[in-house]
Amino acid sequence: MSANLKYLSLGILVFQTTSLVLTMRYSRTLKEEGPRYLSSTAVVVAEFLKIMACIFLVYKDSKCSVRALNRVLHDEILNKPMETLKLAIPSGIYTLQNNLLYVALSNLDAATYQVTYQLKILTTALFSVSMLGKKLGVYQWLSLVILMAGVAFVQWPSDSQELNSKDLSTGSQFVGLMAVLTACFSSGFAGVYFEKILKETKQSVWIRNIQLGFFGSIFGLMGVYVYDGELVSKNGFFQGYNQLTWIVVALQALGGLVIAAVIKYADNILKGFATSLSIILSTIISYFWLQDFVPTSVFFLGAILVIAATFLYGYDPKPAGNPTKA
């Protein structure tokens, strides 16, 4: 049963991530009158939707009893403040990570950023080994290195994108490099820390998602105030929202639920593979649908490497002859 849930959750993650990327691209390219929707507010609304969905799922698990739901929420969240506070750590780190990536993008050329940021694949594996005691074989480590290279090639910027930042100073590039490296380590730690909480405590995935969403909403509202406070006060929180925007928000909320399920029933490393495959899938669909991407030989090389790495990670060599104990 758990194996079925693992592959089902990974499949849904690929579908959700691909759909989200495509709808986000499409929604941001539409030319409409009035202001565009603010991505910072969309993140907050998605967190609230995720919380509401999780409360409904807890309600369903409580045999559709409002009294039982209130008891579960009271016992598992209000009566366990320290357990709830544990989720402030990954939520805060994710917020910090988003800010670090903004600094990195402002101080690095696109190619350096894309290649360096793929180190998060290896940092996730390192934290999985050190914090969860996960054992990886030689083929699995090799597949992670190949995956890192493949994703970097798939997302390699075109010549027109590279022309933007040729005159960056050495000091500026150092700041950008430190920012992206810190983001890589924080991403790996936060993901594995959340996995450790999900797998080593008795609270359900939905309760943990409510706790994570609570802190995510707080940090998200802080982000709205800092980055878009002036625009919100001028045009409103829901400026630019339309039917497509709500689809994007709903997909983001679904992503939070699916990622938690993937981490619970699979792990962060497999999540990385699923996300990498969705990058390729969304890019190919984008070429045919949105026509905003022209595949290059570098992209095809990266796609081959990602697919090869995926198969290599699952490769389990049969011991020949008399097996020896490690």
Swiss-Prot record:
Membrane topology: Multi-pass membrane protein
GO cellular component labels: Golgi membrane
Keyword Translocase found: no
Signal peptide per UniProt: none
Keywords of this entry: Antiport, Golgi apparatus, Membrane, Sugar transport, Transmembrane, Transmembrane helix, Transport
Outcome after substituting residue 180 to F: Decreases UDP-GlcNAc transport activity
Effect of residue 42 to V: Does not affect UDP-GlcNAc transport activity
Molecular function as annotated in GO: antiporter activity; UDP-galactose transmembrane transporter activity
Compartments, as annotated in UniProt: Golgi apparatus membrane
Membrane-crossing residue ranges in chain numbering: 4-24, 38-58, 136-156, 174-194, 212-232, 243-263, 269-289, 293-313
Presence of the UniProt keyword Transmembrane helix in the record: yes
Post-translational modification, as annotated: O-Glcnacylation regulates the stability of SLC35A3 and the specific complex formation with MGAT4B.
Reaction(s) this enzyme catalyzes, per UniProt: UMP(out) + UDP-N-acetyl-alpha-D-glucosamine(in) = UMP(in) + UDP-N-acetyl-alpha-D-glucosamine(out)
GO biological process: UDP-N-acetylglucosamine transmembrane transport
Role description: Transports diphosphate-N-acetylglucosamine (UDP-GlcNAc) from the cytosol into the lumen of the Golgi apparatus, functioning as an antiporter that exchanges UDP-N-acetyl-alpha-D-glucosamine for UMP. May supply UDP-GlcNAc as substrate for Golgi-resident glycosyltransferases that generate highly branched, multiantennary complex N-glycans and keratan sulfate. However, the exact role of SLC35A3 still needs to be elucidated, it could be a member of a catalytically more efficient multiprotein complex rather than function independently as a single transporter.
Subunit structure: Interacts with SLC35A2; the interaction is reduced in the presence of SLC35A4. Found in a complex with SLC35A2 and SLC35A4. Interacts with MGAT4B.
Family designation: Belongs to the nucleotide-sugar transporter family. SLC35A subfamily.
Protein name, UniProt field: UDP-N-acetylglucosamine transporter
Organism of this sequence: Mus musculus (Mouse)
Gene: Slc35a3
